[in-house]
Amino acid sequence: MKEKRKPPHKTRFVAFVAASVDGRISLTKRTPPDWTSKEDWRFFQNSLSKVDAVVVGWNTYQAATVRLRKRNTFVLSDRLNGLRRRGSVTFVNPSSVDLAKLLSEYKSVAVLGGGMVYCTLLGNNLLDEIYITVEPLIFGRGKEMFVGCTRTTRLHLLSMRRLNRSGTLLLHYGII
């Protein structure tokens, strides 16, 4: 009797974004979102405990180097050719490496930003879901949520939850 082979698993890519009401994810480069609510931080930490790897951009990595060294971390940067590993951190140029193949050994990958990273994964049809925490703040300046996207992406709302009395919202979208 022939043994049935399991179909290969598909890696699930989930983006996590903390944003102001005007869609800003940071006031300046390399600053962690220390302006988010404790409820968002709790949700974020709980979510990260369930993933196998994280994908970040260079500035996000610089802002959170110590915390990211403890995980399987992939840092996207167009400043290098190919791929370079340093412990549990892999630095990779997304235009010279097949990201889907590189990350295929993982079941669940958290995409933590910044704006160019979100667009890179959207452009490669890798994102499956996006969680956006909207904090009740207006910055009026700063880094945008999505930078360099070259096409329109349709989303469908999976859930919406109010996290606190201040009005912090957690939006959960699926990618269509």
Predicted regions mapped to residue ranges:
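Enzymes that bind and transform nitrogen-containing heteroaromatic metabolites
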Residues: 1-176
